[in-house]
Amino acid sequence: MSGYSNGGGYGGISSFALIVVLFILLIIVGTAFVGGF
């Protein structure tokens, strides 16, 4: 795990934060789409 975070251009925290942000945006868009109808 540590070798992967240190070897790539992305850090372990930044890649995890990016996934979390995309997941949150997906939830927001999904709730807005369902709420629209």
UniProtKB/Swiss-Prot annotation:
The chain crosses the membrane at residues 16-36. Its main location: membrane. The keyword Transmembrane helix applies. Keywords: Membrane, Transmembrane, Transmembrane helix. It is found in: Membrane. Pfam families: YjcZ_2 (PF09680). It comes from the Bacteria. Belongs to the SscA family. This is Uncharacterized membrane protein YczN. It comes from Bacillus subtilis (strain 168).
